[in-house]
A protein has these predicted regions:
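CheY-like receiver
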Residues: 2, 6, 124-140
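Two-component/phosphorelay signaling modules centered on CheY-like receiver
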Residues: 14-38
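Acidic, metal-coordinating helix/loop segments flanking the phosphotransfer/catalytic sites
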Residues: 38-54, 62
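Alpha4 helix (beta4-alpha4-beta5 surface) of REC/receiver domains from two-component response regulators
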Residues: 68, 88-104
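C-terminal output helix
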Residues: 92, 110-119
Length: 140
């Protein structure tokens, strides 16, 4: 991963311990700064007033908190991008996630290349937005 990717924090809120360990290990192996949250309240405190971050969560967390999880996260960090780890048979959950502007839903087996590609795409999008802001400031 490049230097700009390392600046974007990855927040992990995953109920399945095996999947959580896998994602945290994936972040470590790729020099990504990852932070885990014990629950939604802790996550909201960590992301509050951030301009951007990646949040990786699984369907267990969404099932535990319901659809309000999306609004809580969006209010705390409007610039955060969510990646949802879910199963293909959870179409209702996927539909709900899309309706709440989740960046992507990733299906098992949560391949390393797929997770990293999503993170890279988010970082590229953030970088482009930052460049546009800089350009607008120069125009003024």
């Amino acid at each position: 991963m490049n230097g700009s990717t390392q600046k974007i924090p990855i927040f992990v809120l995953i109920g399945n311990e095996k999947v959580k360990s896998y994602i945290i290990d994936l972040c470590k192996r790729n020099n990504l700064r990852s932070f885990t949250g014990a629950d939604l309240e802790e996550l909201v405190k960590k992301i509050k007033k951030r301009s951007g971050a990646v949040i990786v969560m699984d369907y267990e967390v969404v099932n535990a908190y319901g659809a309000r999880i999306y609004s809580r996260i969006n209010v705390a960090c409007p610039g955060c991008n969510l990646l949802l780890l879910c199963d293909q048979d959870q179409r209702d959950l996927i539909k709900e996630a899309v309706e709440h502007d989740v960046y992507a839903c990733i299906l098992p087996p949560y391949e390393e290349w797929e997770v990293l590609t999503m993170i890279r795409n988010i970082v590229a999008k953030e970088k482009l937005q930052d460049q546009k802001k800089l350009y607008k400031k120069k125009e003024l």
